[in-house]
Curated annotation (Swiss-Prot):
GO biological process: DNA recombination; positive regulation of metabolic process; regulation of DNA-templated transcription; regulation of translation
Keyword DNA-binding in record: yes
Gene3D superfamilies referenced in this protein's UniProt entry, alphabetically: IHF-like DNA-binding proteins
Organism of derivation: Caulobacter sp. (strain K31)
Keyword Membrane attributed: no
Protein name (database record): Integration host factor subunit alpha
Length: 100
């Protein structure tokens, strides 16, 4: 993996090296996996990846905010957001890796 960002191409290459499928098959596998996660979230379902974390769609209610340009109050519309909460296993792994 190059740099500090893991990309789809990096995932495909890692699967190719680990599993030995063709790069094209690995790309299809990664794309299908990400599509399944996205489709579940579109339906409002929770995606739990054991040992990794939980992706969840949450509803945020309307609230009063502020226009950053003018400083005047402005209503922020209700919306849906995607949240991610890392599992305890993932948190511990990151703490060990970062010397925490």
């Amino acid at each position: 993996m190059k740099g500090a960002t893991l990309t789809r191409a990096d995932l495909c290459e890692a699967v190719h090296e680990e599993v030995g499928l063709t790069r094209q098959d690995c790309a299809g596998l990664v794309e299908r996996t990400l599509d399944l996660v996205a489709e579940a979230l579109e339906k409002g379902e929770t995606v739990k990846l054991s040992g990794f974390g939980v992706f969840q769609v949450r509803d945020k209610r309307a609230r009063m905010g502020r226009n950053p340009k003018t400083g005047e109050p402005a209503e922020i519309e209700p919306r849906r957001v995607i949240g991610f909460r890392a599992s305890q296993v993932m948190k511990a792994r990151i703490d060990r890796a970062l010397g925490g």
